[in-house]
Amino acid sequence: MNRAGRWFARILILLAIVALTMAAAPLAEARGKKVPRSEGIDVSHWQGTIDWPRVAGAGKKFVFLKASEGRNYTDPTYAGNRQAAKAAGLRTGAYHFARPETVAGDAVGEAQVFVAAAKLQSGDLRPVLDIEVNGGLGVAALQAWVRTWLDEVYRLTGQRAIVYTSPNFWRTSMGDTQSIAQAGYTTLWIAHWGASSPTVPAGNWAGYGWSFWQYSSTGRVSGISGDVDLDRARTTDLAPYLVP
């Protein structure tokens, strides 16, 4: 084989290796084998003082921090926890706990409160909408509220937010709509505790599946007193979920 032929053969081998590597994780998952994941947590003021170096030492790679709730509340521990978690080597992200009331002005106002509080930077995890209460809104109104909030955050930041919810809430209060994922909000953080794998609503999130999974609300982690939410990313590569 001449030199050009040998190089061509090597390229084909490399391409085959890449293809096999990309296929390995879904295949292993389908067969019930363990796939490498990044482990993380989410916290708010309820966790009190946190020893972030110990959290990092426990193998946690990322944390979602509560930044705001409704239109009038910002978490007093957010800024300090964010700084300390980053210093300990964790990827940090911010979430907003939604308190839907009316659609247009309320959703826009909550989005603006969140963006001002979160102060997201390059390398942070993308913003998160935590939607788990309906505020008395019907399905159509709540769908409009969620879309309005997401679109306003996108307008202000250029980032398509991650959606946090539970399977039951999305089905009952959001009508199991696929419209949010189909509108480009394809990153789902699903809360499903005590399961071997999460149930994903909205037609497997319009085919995109889950990206983050909150698998326990009663976890114990070194550096934190009491219970804490435990989370898992679907992959060890968090790059697709980061602010550029």
What are the language-model segments listed below?
Residues 19-35:
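C-terminal region of N-terminal signal peptides and the immediate post-cleavage residues
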